[in-house]
Regions:
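Carbohydrate-binding surfaces of carbohydrate-active enzymes
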Residues: 2-6, 12-45, 49-50, 58, ...
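Acidic/aromatic-lined carbohydrate-recognition and catalytic surfaces
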Residues: 3-147, 151
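Cys/His-rich Zn2+-binding cysteine-cluster or related metal-binding knuckle/ribbon modules and their
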Residues: 155
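Short, conserved beta-strand segments of beta-strand-rich sandwich/propeller modules, principally
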Residues: 583, 666-668
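Aromatic-lined ligand-binding clefts that engage carbohydrates, nucleic acids, or primary amines
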Residues: 617-642, 669-673
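Surface-exposed, short loops/turns at beta-strand junctions within beta-sandwich domains
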Residues: 661-664
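Edge beta-strands of extracellular beta-sandwich domains
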Residues: 680-684
Length: 703
């Protein structure tokens, strides 16, 4: 993706700018690469680097505020006038269209359309947040402003580069559009635009609800209801005015609408994207809150939106400012791997790394939402290994279907987080199903709800999710025919009681295991992801018959697996190292290999190193396998054994198989470490390794 960022000196959208973009596209075309164009000069999208507002100042991001009629400026844009009654504490009591006769407790207020004062991040140092020349954000709730935005950006790109569209150029990326803009002054205001009141009414609002958004309200229920209706109104208008306009343009020009909305839980907007997407930045999700953060739903929502709309791809813009809090350049290869596996476990199949910088030679560049996750970081020489890993797991998640035990109903108003946490921990698969998809895409067939390729026998509805009579009626049609619906905030007890699984993982300490059962090209696959720091061992139990193989996502190599046949099906012994994945595929045309009874178990002897860069150890002739292991590495270790390169360690588990390089008698190990780029661009962090151990395996080691 070509992303104009802070520090770009060439004038945005100038002829020189397009010459540079064309050069990039020609280079990509020669290499058979695909390119996504970015629709803004930084972000959020929608203003064309301020050009929309420069052409018509009325198209700046708008807001509604309440002003006493007697204080309303003569040039103010008054949209509505209400008579408001406040109690002695200044809280809203009543709203009238006309002054009640004989009651002077009502005061006339004008509801005035004004401006948010919001901006976007621009390209020059004086155009960043809070800077005097930050470009003005546009009123993206106004379809005329959005049309002007596409004229300045999309039409210009097509005018200059149309020969690449639908070939090298596959999409336009829109980035977290904001109705208020950044750094907006929203005290006593709400985002608004012309003719939005009709939408507000259609979403269930009344005059009292509108007033409750601008005045303190004693009744908390009224305040919550008003906020809910307002959020629904804004979402609806944003979808119609902004996303639909961009979607129509992209389809008319043979490219996909890509990017992501501003909120992690904005699932209703995702249906407008040809490639539903989200972003994982600013450590919104970490290893500690992977199942509990409100933002943890993002990747699953995008993947499930693609599943239900029939889109083959879904994306995630990831890694931006995901390093150590306060020291973002301290972002290790293992950190990157954890985030990748988090995304793959939830169905993501298009990774958009944030970001690759051509240069970090100045503080403006090196401090622009670090770290660089490409050419200016320590793993660049190994990036092909990382890219191939991404490619293989993206392939696995593309044009495959998962096997959900249940659908979890959701909307942009509420996406259940806590109720699904035990489902993840217990290995039950679910898909988020939006109310919009339930009502407009799903069919009730006998006792099931069917959406595209997915058939749901069980529907889980969080008791905190607002639903109306029409939704209840459609669910009821399924239930009266034998379908299962559970309305509660406790999902796991119901699922364990009512769902019978034929494929699952059985082991100890599996809370950090994510179990994914996929079907692709007629073959069953199992993606087992360890999101924790402790090795997980156990058994994959399945009724799937065929020749099983362990698929190495780093190399593409496969190795056959043997199963034990029991009354539960076929059982495969599996070990998933920390922060790692295990991919098991089954060829239904092959035959199951059964494990032999009484296979000898190798004994283990460990030799601890001194924690320095070199160590020696003695190896007997009866040793059959030798592994090198570290407790921790900061950040990349290059290993030599007996003077020969043994490999490079970037990720957990910090281990290497060095069997082929060892010899009977004395052996030497040399370790050199490359430290974090935080030591160059951020705050100093440790460089080195911990807990070096040589593990010797053999039949007679216990003797």
């Amino acid at each position: 993706m070509i992303h104009p960022r802070l520090g770009l000196e060439t004038e945005y959208l100038s002829d020189e700018y397009f010459e540079l973009v064309e050069a990039c596209l020609e280079a990509a075309e020669r290499r058979h690469m695909m390119v996504v164009l970015y629709d803004e000069a930084m972000y959020p999208s929608g203003s064309a680097h301020g050009r929309v507002v420069a052409e018509d100042k009325r198209f700046a991001a708008r807001a509604l505020t309440a002003v006493r009629t007697e204080e309303t400026p003569a040039d103010a844009e008054v949209l509505y006038r209400f008579w408001i009654k406040l109690n002695s504490g200044g809280q809203l009591e009543d709203v009238r269209l006309d002054q009640p006769k004989g009651d002077e407790s009502y005061v006339s207020y004008d509801f005035v359309l004004t401006y948010t004062g919001g901006t976007i991040r621009g390209l020059l140092p004086d155009e960043d947040d809070g800077q005097p020349n930050a470009p003005a954000a546009a009123d993206i709730l106004n379809p005329y402003a959005v049309q002007l935005f596409t004229q300045h950006t999309h039409d210009r790109y097509y005018e200059k580069l149309s020969r690449f569209f639908g070939k090298t150029v596959i999409g336009f990326f829109t980035d977290e559009p904001s109705v208020s803009g950044r750094c907006a002054d929203m005290k006593g205001k709400i985002s608004w635009t012309y003719d939005l009141l009709e939408d507000f009414f259609e979403c269930g609002g009344e005059f009292t609800d509108l007033a409750a958004l601008l005045f303190p309200t004693k009744d908390k229920k009224t305040a919550r209801n008003a906020a809910r209706i307002y959020k629904k109104t804004i979402s609806r208008r944003l979808n119609d005015a902004y996303y639909q306009t961009l979607s129509d343009w992209c389809r008319a020009h043979n490219v996909a609408l890509m990017g992501h909305p501003a909120e992690s839980g904005d699932c209703d907007t995702l249906r407008k994207f040809d490639v539903p997407g989200q972003d994982l930045v600013w450590r919104m999700v970490t290893e500690e809150n992977a199942l509990t953060s409100p933002d943890s739903v993002m990747a699953k929502l995008a993947a499930d939106s693609a599943r239900h709309t029939g889109a083959s791809r879904n994306s995630n813009e990831c890694f931006g400012v995901c390093g150590e809090a306060g020291n973002p350049w301290n972002f290790t290869p293992d950190n990157m791997m954890w985030y990748l596996n988090f995304l793959f476990a939830r169905g993501c199949n298009m990774i958009i790394p944030h970001a690759f910088y051509y240069s970090v030679r100045t503080p403006v560049q090196s401090n622009e939402r670090p770290p660089d996750v490409g050419p200016n970081n320590i793993w660049w020489k190994d990036y092909r290994k990382i890219a191939m890993y991404i490619k293989r797991l993206s392939w696995l998640n593309t044009t495959s279907v998962n096997h959900p035990d249940a659908a979890v109903l959701c909307s942009s108003e509420h996406v259940p987080v806590k109720p699904v946490e035990p489902l993840y921990k217990k290995g039950y698969t679910f898909n988020y199903l939006t109310i919009d998809d339930l009502m407009n895409r799903a069919r009730v067939v006998d006792d099931t709800i069917r959406v595209d390729q997915y058939i749901y026998k069980v529907l889980l509805v969080d008791s905190r999710l607002p639903i109306d009579a029409a939704i209840v009626e459609k669910i009821g049609r399924c239930v009266i025919q034998g379908g299962l619906m559970h309305n509660s905030s406790n999902f796991i007890d119901y699922v364990e009681k009512n769902v019978k699984r034929t494929s699952y993982f059985e082991g100890e300490n599996t809370d950090d295991l994510r179990f994914v059962h996929l079907s692709k090209s007629g073959c069953p696959f199992f993606l087992l992801v360890n999101e924790g720091r402790t090795e997980i061992t156990g058994k994959l139990v399945t009724d799937q018959n065929g020749a099983a193989a362990d698929f190495d996502a780093f190399t593409g190599n496969t190795s056959p697996m043997a199963a034990e046949m029991t009354g539960r099906g076929f059982e495969y012994k599996v070990t998933i190292p920390p922060h790692s994945v295990k991919v098991i595929g089954i060829n239904p045309k092959g035959f199951v290999t059964l494990a032999k009874d009484g296979e000898p178990e190798l004994h283990l002897r460990e030799i601890a190193g001194l924690g320095e860069g070199n160590m020696t150890f003695t190896c007997r002739e009866d040793i059959t396998k030798v592994r090198l292991a570290f407790t921790d590495i900061h950040d990349i270790a290059d290993v030599k054994v007996n003077g020969k390169d043994a490999g490079r360690i970037l990720f957990m588990p910090y281990e290497l198989d060095i069997t082929e390089l060892t010899q009977p008698g004395e052996n030497t190990v040399e370790v050199s470490v490359t430290g974090s780029m935080a030591n160059t661009y951020g705050k100093p962090v440790p460089v080195g390794f911990e807990g070096l151990t040589v593990r010797l395996y053999g039949d007679a080691l216990s003797q």
